[in-house]
Amino acid sequence: MRETTVDQLAAAIDQGAPVVDVREPAEFREGHVPGATNIPMGQLTVRLGEIDRDRPVHVVCASGNRSSAMADVLTANGFDAINVVGGTSAWARSGRPIEK
C-alpha cells in the first residue's frame, strides 16, 4: 500500500483522482475532502464495484488509521490504493476547503 500527503492529494484531485472516505456517514456529513465518495469501512467489501479499478484511488478517514486498513483491503482486491496520511484532520489543518 502506498501513502501520500494532503499536499500530494490536492494535486491529485486537481488531476481528477478519485477519493474514497471510509468514515461513517455522520462523520462524512460533518465535513469531507471535496469530491470524496463516502463508503464506510464496514461496507467497503460489498461496494467494491463502485470504485474505478483503472485509476489509483486515494483513501481517507479522520486521521489515517482506518484508511490505512481499508487501503490494504483495496490493494488485496486488485486496486491501486493510496492511504492519505493524517486524513481529513490533516486536510483541514492545511487550510484546504472542507465540503459539507
Please tell me what each predicted stretch does:
Residues 1-18, 24-56, 65-100:
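Rhodanese-like catalytic fold shared by cysteine-dependent sulfurtransferases
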Residues 60:
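Short, surface-exposed ligand- or partner-binding patches at beta-edge/loop junctions that are enriched
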